[in-house]
Curated annotation (Swiss-Prot):
This is ATP synthase gamma chain. It comes from Corynebacterium jeikeium (strain K411). One of its GO terms (molecular function) is ATP binding. Gene3D superfamilies: 3.40.1380.10, ATP synthase, gamma subunit, helix hairpin domain. GO terms for cellular component: plasma membrane; proton-transporting ATP synthase complex. F-type ATPases have 2 components, CF(1) - the catalytic core - and CF(0) - the membrane proton channel. CF(1) has five subunits: alpha(3), beta(3), gamma(1), delta(1), epsilon(1). CF(0) has three main subunits: a, b and c. It is found in: Cell membrane. Disulfide bonds: none annotated.
Length: 326
């Protein structure tokens, strides 16, 4: 058993750590509210630009690469969105596992995979394992800024438009030397963490480019006449100015850029939620550990007092016996 002094020193140390984890928990809680508000604020713009792009795509004859399904894709880029700091439980490990699954699938399809990483933890993770990172950006995982994420968003779009046979211009954060042309790619995938609730964050992986076409089934209300030629309402056509092709060509990069930034906002909220959960668990564990150590310390103190009393009583008895013998 450890000495009483050692136990008291350890209790003091655990209490100090508990103060840190509690402070981190409170900070993460306040950041979650802000991050959620940013996600909610971005939704109206996301919904509107999605609706406009869908309308334009339906009315356009534009044969844009962003809209074309790949036929002979040979090179795929993956953007891994991780955190800049730790102490957030399994948040980053879940992202890395999801990335490994996606990478394995793409390689099985015969595609060369290029890694782009956002966040210091992801950069450290892949550098430690000797993985080749084509581009790395950090410093904004908890509070993404549209200007700060410009280079990563623009490079993914430019690299895709260039294709695996072409090159894109150099941007800040790329591994290539400044001014050197960078090889493009045929697909862009993103791995991030979707915020579901304070207690649930789910790693997601989906293809950003080319845009996956989603066909929605037409919904009919109960009692609607589906047989006769009678029509109660007519959907009006839209007149676009300038023409749909020009508008779509201008909006598609903005649409993709918005998707990347939205994923970063979701990841920021998920990171704070994961850190709050981890720090809350650490604080609870510290409280339990202090209770256990205090119990052991009290037992040690009680044993020490008992030993002292026994020694005093024994000494008094010895003195009494020696006095009687005199």
């Amino acid at each position: 058993m450890a000495s009483l002094r050692e136990l008291r020193t350890r209790i003091k140390s655990v209490n100090s750590t508990k103060k840190i984890t509690k402070a981190q928990e409170l900070i993460a809680t306040s950041r979650i509210t802000k991050a959620q508000a940013r996600v909610d604020d971005a939704e109206p713009y996301a919904d509107e630009i999605t609706r406009v792009v869908q309308r334009l795509a339906a009315a356009s004859t534009l044969d844009h690469k962003i809209l074309q399904e790949p036929t002979d894709a040979s090179r795929a880029a993956i953007l891994v969105v991780s955190s800049d700091r730790g102490m957030c439980g399994g948040y980053n490990n879940n992202v890395f596992k999801k990335t490994a699954e996606l990478r394995k699938r793409l390689e099985n399809e015969g595609k060369d995979v290029v890694l782009y990483v956002s966040g210091n933890k992801g950069i450290s993770y892949y550098n430690f394992r000797g993985e080749d990172i084509a581009g790395a950006w950090s410093g904004y995982s908890q509070d993404p800024d549209y200007a700060a994420t410009h280079d990563v968003r623009r490079h993914l779009i430019d690299g895709f438009v260039a294709g695996s046979e072409g090159t894109a211009k150099w941007r800040e954060g790329l591994k290539a030397e400044e001014g050197q042309a960078v090889q493009g790619f045929d697909e862009v995938h993103i791995v991030y963490t979707r915020f579901e609730s304070m207690l649930s964050q789910k790693p997601e992986a989906h293809r950003l480019l080319p845009i996956e076409t989603v066909v929605e089934e037409e919904k009919f209300e109960l009692g609607e006449d589906l047989v006769s030629d009678k029509v109660d309402h007519i959907a009006a056509d839209y007149d676009f100015e300038p023409d749909p092709d020009t508008l779509l060509k201008a909006l598609l990069p903005q649409y993709v850029s918005r998707g990347i930034f939205a994923a970063m906002l979701e990841s920021a909220a998920s990171e704070s939620a994961a850190r709050r959960t981890a720090m809350s668990a650490a604080t609870d564990n510290a409280t339990d550990l202090v209770k256990q150590l205090s119990r052991v310390a009290n037992q040690a103190r009680q044993a020490q007092i008992t030993q002292e009393i026994t020694e005093i009583v024994g000494g008094a008895s010895a003195l009494a016996d020696s006095g009687e013998s005199d």
